[in-house]
Amino acid sequence: GGRVQRFREDFTRLPSMATLGKLWDDHPEAALNAANQVGYVLAAELRSRGVDYSFTPVLDLDYGPSRVIGDRAFHRQPEAVVALAGALAAGLRQAGMGSCGKHFPGHGYVVPDSHVALPVDDRSLEAMQEDLIPYRQLSLDAVMAAHVIYDCMDCNTAVFSNKWISYLRNDIKFNG
């Protein structure tokens, strides 16, 4: 949804995930309902046109300075991200589509756009624990790793890191 909605012509305009996060701040139940509806509409419209999967939801925490993530993130608080992403994923499932949490282990803290640069997150694993909460608490069908280097774990980007993939499988217990 929002600025990164790829299918636009003859599709419902969906709000950015940050719009749902702002609604969460004042009206959590309404935000959960809206997130569920967004997931359902997104999946139903794509499936009606032969697209069977969308790489959503974004699980990055909104730390503020990352413009590439920006309004693609639901919220700064992991509890809000878990609730809203869970509701969106439920809507996807209701319309017959799986969910893919991204960008593991978290892209929201770094400023550079990983589509054009190679961001490095220099936080410790301990400092990243909030970013990992959505991956620990949600039941996801798939996870997309980030094209970001996390010095605390590896010199490779998470997408090419056996250490991060092992952490996802063994510590977080992801089995999708």
Regions found by a protein language model. Name each.
Residues 1-81, 109-121, 146-156:
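Enzymes and membrane/adaptor proteins characterized by extended Gly/Ser/Thr/Asp/Glu-rich
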Residues 80-176:
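Second-shell residues forming the walls of enzyme active-site clefts
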